[in-house]
Regions:
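N-terminal, positively charged/glycine-rich alpha-helical extensions of SAM-dependent methyltransferases
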Residues: 1-31, 36-41
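Conserved alpha-helix/loop element of class I SAM-dependent methyltransferases that forms part
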Residues: 34-55, 66-70
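Class I SAM-dependent methyltransferase SAM/SAH-binding core
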Residues: 55-127, 151
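A short glycine-rich, Lys/Arg-flanked "PGG" loop and its adjoining helix->strand segment in the class I
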Residues: 150-162
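Conserved beta-strand signature within the Rossmann-like core of class I S-adenosyl-L-methionine
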Residues: 163-170
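Short, glycine-/aromatic-enriched active-site segment of Class I SAM-dependent methyltransferases
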Residues: 173-192, 202-204, 210-211, 216-218, ...
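Conserved Class I S-adenosyl-L-methionine
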Residues: 217-274
Length: 274
């Protein structure tokens, strides 16, 4: 199916180099991995309801490879391809992938397809893959870091076979709302991404050639005792890669106004929610 040629749509003025540099230090994002694991578990629950037997699976934005083993377990006959734009993430992903090496060799003798896990470094919007070569695209909390999601969807559609399946998750417009509101009390700079609404994603999917897209929303609230821990997790989730972000440190008075605004948002149980 041909992909319509539409002008690219910017989700936000995201600095791709900043994103890649941030995720090139896996230790910085490790404290936030609890959320990716929770979302991954919920995605796998949904995927279990779909009866498919893929031969090639792409984990787009695989990070340090936490989802590769589960995908390999779910589809032992498939070749699992992990792709990420950050070279350091590829190096981190080699550890879980190498644990499957012995099983890969065993399966390759029994199965006609190339079973196992392979790793690629590349952009979500410029896949180093042939057209119609993937049966399942999996992407967990990666899409929102790309400035042109419609371009990413077009690439995923190009790589997928006609009856292929796309399963992805990403942050929505209400994500980090508390942080945006608190910083708005301090200055006029953006301090968090304006994440895309799922209805806009649905339109993009249809425009790029996907049929019958089904999207839904789940709310996950993480609670904190202190504003400092909340802000530390926001940084660990990916920080602020906007080209319009403040350059340099915020003044002490402005920082205190932001903290005071956060404190006003405490819940009845005394916790801060995010």
């Amino acid at each position: 199916m041909p992909v319509p040629a539409n002008p690219p749509k910017m989700s936000a003025p995201i600095d791709a180099v900043q994103v890649r540099d941030f995720f090139s230090r896996p230790a910085r994002i490790a404290p936030s991995d609890f959320l990716r694991r929770e979302v991954s578990a919920r995605m796998h629950e949904r995927l279990e309801l779909v009866k498919i037997t893929p031969l090639r699976v792409l984990d787009a934005g695989c990070g340090p490879g936490a989802d590769l083993a589960q995908l390999h377990k779910d589809y032992p006959a498939a070749q699992i391809i992990g792709l990420d734009a950050a070279q350091a993430m590829m190096q981190a992903a080699r550890a879980p992938a190498s644990k499957l090496a012995g099983l890969n060799q065993f399966l390759s003798k029994l199965l006609p397809a190339k079973a196992g896990v392979d790793l690629l470094c590349g952009d979500l919007g410029d896949l180093p893959l042939a057209p119609n070569s993937i049966d399942l695209v999996w992407s967990n909390l990666a899409l929102h870091w790309h400035a042109q999601p419609d371009r990413v969807f077009a690439e995923w559609r190009r790589a997928l076979r006609l009856d292929g399946l796309l399963m992805f998750s990403c942050f929505g417009p209400d994500t980090f709302r508390e942080v945006r509101d608190a910083f708005a009390e301090a200055d006029l700079y953006p301090h968090a991404l304006p994440f895309v609404d799922m209805h806009d994603f649905g339109d993009m999917l249809v425009e790029t050639g996907f049929s019958t897209p089904v999207l839904d929303m789940e709310i996950i609230t993480v609670t904190y005792d202190t504003a400092e821990k909340l802000l530390a997790d926001v940084r660990a989730f990916g920080g602020n890669p906007l080209t319009t972000r403040r350059r340099g440190l915020m003044g002490k008075a402005a920082w205190q106004r932001m903290l005071a605004a956060l404190e006003k948002m405490r819940r009845p149980d005394g916790k801060l929610g995010l």
